[in-house]
Amino acid sequence: EIAESKTPYKHKELWKIFAVWAVLKGIQLPGWPELNDTPNRRIKGRFDELIKIRKFKESIPDWMDKLGVDELGEKKWGNELNALNQKASVIIRVNSLKTSIDKVQEILSDEDIQTEKIKGFPDALKLVVRKNLFLTNAFKNGFFEIQDASSQLVAPFLQIEEGMKICDVCAGAGGKTLHLSALSKNKGQIIAMDIYKNKLHELKRRAKRNNAFNIETRVIENNKPIKRLYGKIDRLLIDSPCSGLGVLKRNPGSKWNLSLDFLNKIRTAQQDILQKYAPMIKKDGKLVYATCSILPSENELQIDKFLKSEIGKDFKKEDEK
């Protein structure tokens, strides 16, 4: 914006972009002829103007800023954006199938990795200083998985009891599936389903490391494996595909790959998934629908639409406890 350049960049425009970057970073420009006419004062003045505008300050596309305001309101959207632009903490979930949170904290401390417990999250530890956890013996032995604190809230909502038949229908590589296994204490049956075979292969590898032996994976190639489970599941987790707007701090570049067209398609897919998988649940069973988006149109509004549908009319939304 300040360099007044647009893609695809020409050679001259690249010099202008470099000049703007250097001036704003306080770097003295080299005496190269391409930089002789750099307007330092104008660059700084223009920056001071733009930094007051949210879409520039928070670095988001125009359409996304409008969408956020429309769905959340000015104040809440501004607060969410500010939080999403903060550096993400490294959070782990201790694998209770193998060890305890105190033991993992002690083991990591011996490897010069300091952690803190998080109030309200019984299996979570936060790293005081970011370090490579994948090289630790504790990770290699399956004592923990890296999993955001908010993600660790999802599985407990299912209120699992030992011996239940549980289905995770958008399992992916299985972060929440492994948590379900730990909560079930390796008893009962967990069916992890996904359309991507390679992700389920990774889940199998992780499950072996975690000593999670009650997980069965099934690749969804058609509707047959879904319909076979109609009326047979005690607990159903739909960790639905979404825009990912709630985890931009983990993957900030993804916002530039999103579009309204994609968002509309993903909303349609979310409702289709609810309609297709909800009949799996037994009478008096429970369904948890989760996304990593902050948009009501991907969360509350999807649930409200489902509850008004023919398939969803017999479901009742529970209040958060």
Question: What are the language-model segments listed below?
Answer:
Residues 102-321:
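Rossmann-like S-adenosyl-L-methionine
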Residues 1-134, 232:
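Class I Rossmann-like S-adenosyl-L-methionine
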